Amino acid sequence: MSADRACLKSYTACFAIRANAEPGILPRLIGLFAKRDLVPAAVLSRRFGDQQLAVDLQIDGIDRALAELIAENMRQMVSVERVLLADLPAELAGRA
């Protein structure tokens, strides 16, 4: 395995999304990964208030350019209010 590939596998892209609490929003968000043959390492969804949803998604081994593209696709969804993207070393994401 190349050094670049090993480094890529040691990082996790973390997406923090705030959206309207609509029934179809979770499958649409996760679908952005599925159509790229990616499976999230972690998904956490929390509803707050009557109409708000906070979603945290973590994806291991994704490069920054693809993560930014997916974040931009999320931002274009009507129900999505905000998307934050961060890179975490795998050990900080809870997986060593």
Name each region found by the language model.
Residues 1-96:
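A conserved regulatory-domain signal marking ACT and ACT-like small-molecule sensing domains
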